[in-house]
Swiss-Prot record:
This is Cytochrome c oxidase subunit 2. Cu cation A2 binds at C195, E197, C199, H203. It is an enzyme of class 7 (translocase). It comes from Coturnix japonica. Component of the cytochrome c oxidase (complex IV, CIV), a multisubunit enzyme composed of 14 subunits. The complex is composed of a catalytic core of 3 subunits MT-CO1, MT-CO2 and MT-CO3, encoded in the mitochondrial DNA, and 11 supernumerary subunits COX4I, COX5A, COX5B, COX6A, COX6B, COX6C, COX7A, COX7B, COX7C, COX8 and NDUFA4, which are encoded in the nuclear genome.
């Protein structure tokens, strides 16, 4: 959960998000090195410690061709690795289906016979003390932690987007199309997200709440809900 005046990312709760945070730091260091080099050269030029009347320097042209190529390789390799990791779906222990509506989500646990529900935002007037405004729902998604989860995402009316930042998940929900993604939660907890595609007047009132629990707790919850 993000805190007031927080400058960094939320704590990663999935391997993919951990990789994304590391890649962000890596890219930031590369950008910092480039800025430092440019500022250093500008300082030398402005203090006249580095000046030249040379109008042709093939060595310089070679340097400003090779250095950007090296920078692009340093950014492209980890980026491609993460892209492949995000597209790779392991054999899931559990499959969910999320359907976006104006303006709520409905969920189906396809591995269970009768386990489905709608998830609406909890109105501020009904919000228990200590809960988060505009982020709480009447029915949370409950999943077992440290288990590969596949989620199939679609929409019933207009474009939506199912996103939970701390899990590193953001997938568009498109009417007539099934998109899928996967994730693994690395710790127990409650993770919040929202619809991330403008979908109408109440777009801001489509929160997503994922509760990661030990397997025994999930089995108890699923048996109670499906009975």
């Amino acid at each position: 959960m993000a805190n007031h005046s927080q400058l960094g990312f939320q704590d990663a709760s999935s391997p993919i998000m951990e990789e994304l945070v590391e890649f962000h730091d890596h890219a930031l260091m590369v950008a910092l090195a480039i800025c430092s080099l440019v500022l250093y050269l500008l300082t030398l030029m402005l203090t006249q410690k580095l000046s030249s009347n040379t109008v042709d320097a093939q060595e310089v042209e070679l340097i400003w061709t090779i250095l950007p190529a090296i920078v692009l390789v340093l950014l492209a390799l980890p980026s491609l690795q993460i892209l492949y990791m995000m597209d790779e779906i392991e054999e899931p222990d559990l499959t969910l289906k999320a359907i976006g509506h104006q303006w709520y989500w409905s969920y189906e646990y396809t591995d269970f016979k009768d386990l489905s529900f709608d998830s609406y935002m909890t109105p501020t007037t009904d919000l228990p003390q200590g809960h988060f405004r505009l982020l709480e729902v009447d029915h949370r998604i409950v999943i077992p932690m440290e288990s590969p989860i596949r989620i199939i995402i679609t929409a019933d009316d207009v474009l939506h987007s199912w996103a939970v930042p701390t899990l590193g998940v953001k997938t568009d929900a498109i009417p007539g199309r099934l998109n899928q993604t996967s994730f693994i939660t690395t710790r127990p907890g409650v993770f919040y997200g929202q619809c991330s595609e403008i979908c109408g007047a109440n777009h801001s009132y489509m929160p997503i709440v994922v509760e990661s629990t030990p397997l025994k707790h999930f089995e108890t919850w699923s048996s109670l809900l499906s009975s």
